[in-house]
Curated annotation (Swiss-Prot):
Compositionally biased residues, Pro residues: 54-64, 101-117
Name assigned to this protein: Uncharacterized protein C11orf96 homolog
Disordered: annotated span: 9-125, 155-203
One Pfam family linked to the record: DUF4695
Residues bearing PTM Phosphoserine: 196, 210, 220
Domain of life: Eukaryota
rRNA processing in keyword set: no
Biased composition (Basic residues): 27-37, 161-176
Phosphothreonine carried by residues: 179
Keywords from the UniProt entry: Cytoplasm, Phosphoprotein
InterPro entries named in the record: DUF4695
Record's subcellular location: Cytoplasm
Length: 246
C-alpha cells in the first residue's frame, strides 16, 4: 500500500492532479534561507518538478460520473452486446454476437400453417379456461368491465315496482267510504239491505255533531268580524273628525 501511494505521488506530484499551482511551490522559504551556493541546484530541482508535474486542464472541471453510470459502463465493457434485448424468436447466442438472424418472410393468409403449430394451438386452447379464470380473478378489482366478470359475478336484479293507479288493489268499503265518493250501486245496495237502528243512531249523532261544529265556526267568524268592522268605522270617523276640525 505504501509503495502504491509513493508511486502515485511521484506520478501526480505534491500539488495534486487537478489542483492549480497559484504561487511558487512549497519549500521556497527554506531554499531562500540557504546560502547562495545552493540556489542554482534548488532552481534546477524546482524546474524539474514543474516540468514533471502534469499541467491542470484549462477547460471546465471534469464531472465525476455517478455510481450507476459507472456500473453500467463496466457491465457494457464486460458484455458488449448485453444491452441488446434479443427478440423472442432469436436464440441467445445470436443476440450476444450482435448479428441479427434473418427472419422468415411474412406468411400469406392462404398459405398452409406449419406442421408444429397445430398441436401448440390445441395445447393453448386446452389451457385457456384455467388461465381465463385466473385472469378474471386477478383483474376483478382492476378491470370490472372484463368479459368474464359478467358470468362469474352477475349483477343483482332490481325488484319490480309496485303498480300505480288502476292496477292497485282497492281498499275495503269501510275504510274508503269517507274519502271516496259513493256510487249509485252502493246506495242501492244499502237501500235494499236496510239500516239497523244502531247505524241510524250513529248517523243522527254524527249529523248533529257536524251541525254543531258548523254553528260554532260561523259564530266565531261573526265575532271576529265585529271588532274588525268597528275598527274600520272608528278609523273612518277619526279621519272625518280631523278633516272637519281643520
Amino acid at each position: 500500500m505504501a509503495f502504491a501511494v509513493i508511486r502515485a505521488c511521484s506520478r501526480v506530484g505534491r500539488g495534486g492532479l487537478y489542483k492549480r499551482l497559484g504561487g511558487p511551490p512549497r519549500g521556497t522559504r527554506r531554499q531562500r534561507q540557504r546560502p547562495r551556493q545552493g540556489r542554482q541546484g534548488a532552481s534546477r530541482s524546482i524546474a524539474e518538478q514543474r516540468s514533471a508535474a502534469p499541467r491542470p486542464p484549462t477547460g471546465p472541471p471534469a464531472r465525476y460520473p455517478s455510481p450507476a453510470a459507472s456500473a453500467r459502463a463496466s457491465e457494457a465493457r464486460r458484455h458488449p452486446a448485453a444491452d441488446l434485448d434479443p427478440p423472442p424468436g432469436e436464440p441467445q447466442a445470436v443476440a450476444s454476437r450482435g448479428t441479427p438472424e434473418p427472419r422468415p418472410p411474412p406468411e400469406s393468409p392462404g398459405a398452409p400453417p406449419p406442421p408444429g403449430s397445430a398441436p401448440a394451438d390445441g395445447a393453448m386452447a386446452a389451457a385457456k379456461p384455467g388461465e381465463l379464470m385466473g385472469i378474471c380473478s386477478s383483474y376483478q378489482a382492476v378491470m370490472p368491465h372484463f368479459v368474464c366478470l359478467t358470468d362469474e359475478f352477475p349483477q343483482p336484479v332490481r325488484p319490480a315496482k309496485l303498480p300505480k293507479g288502476k292496477g292497485r288493489l282497492r281498499r275495503p268499503r269501510q275504510s274508503r267510504f269517507k274519502t271516496q265518493p259513493v256510487t249509485f250501486d252502493e246506495i242501492q245496495e244499502v237501500e235494499e239491505e236496510g239500516v239497523s237502528p244502531m247505524e241510524e243512531e250513529k248517523a243522527k249523532k254524527s249529523f248533529l255533531q257536524s251541525l254543531e261544529c258548523l254553528r260554532r265556526s260561523t259564530q266565531s267568524l261573526s265575532l271576529q268580524r265585529e271588532p274588525l268592522g268597528s275598527c274600520k268605522l272608528r278609523n273612518s270617523l277619526d279621519s272625518s273628525d280631523s278633516d272637519s276640525a281643520l
